[in-house]
Amino acid sequence: MRPGTEPGPLQRSGDGRALGPASAKEDAERALFSDHHALFAAAASLIPSLKGSLVAAGEACPALTAATRAAPAEVAKALHGHWQQAHPEAGPAYWLTRSWGMLCWQSIYLAMVAVYRHQAVPALDRMGQGYQAGLVSGFTLPVEPMIRGEVDVLIKRAGERLQAHWQGLFTLLGEGQRLRPGFVRPLLADDLLAALVRVPDFFGEVSRDEVTAHAPHWLAACGLPLAHLAGWREGGLPRDEAFPGYVRQRCCLHYKRRDGELCGNCPRRQGRASCDET
């Protein structure tokens, strides 16, 4: 390049790439997109319905959306109404348990993928979700830098963001239903540990001993009862339907459906802990 012809901050090099500050910004944006798409690919390869997409930074990311374009609280009511109509025989506790589980499953499994496969934590507190015909699937995240660090740092930050996300969902569902923290916290603890115990099956590089050591840290980070560790089975014990890796401490009430039965990790089947419905 001849002296005096160096490109200025708004000029481009011969291959069309912006130079200077503009180039750095574009590179950072590309890295953000690439980072999230790698996370989304890992999540979808594990669970096809755990399918993510991005929204622009600063853009509103509704907590719950449906094709009807209803407000999130109305979508939450529709979710509860679906299970009430589909299984009237199962009763109010089942409808609420099923609805809450639907609202929270994606954030839990995405957190596992993010920490153990992607070694980062996205903006879980600003996660949006899609709803259709009783099922919550598909999610959105804002284009923001992910948190990096050692696994103990990632668990702590993931827990903080999950708590914020769940609080928003609690508010949404609670607008139409009688919902108490004492009802949802045991369900969250069960769902979290039931997902964590499967991580070594999902990702071969993570050992059973590692997730066993991490279990109390996940519960503490998420503000959930440590008493649920009573359902965790040691890594050396056999694992099958008769001896699952984690035994729930609160029954999900699936057996109350006309087509239902006791789950393999049900406390009723295992003779463990509580099946309270309140």
Predicted regions span which residues?
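N-terminal, charged low-complexity regulatory/assembly segments
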Residues: 2, 9-114
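Non-catalytic accessory segments flanking enzymatic or RNA/DNA-binding domains
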Residues: 2, 11-50, 165-185, 189-204, ...
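Cys/His-clustered metal-coordination modules, chiefly Zn-binding fingers
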Residues: 213-278
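Hydrophobic transmembrane signal anchors and adjacent membrane-proximal interface regions, especially
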Residues: 5-8, 12, 18-21, 52, ...
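Hydrophobic, aromatic-lined core segments that form the binding pocket/scaffold
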Residues: 73-242
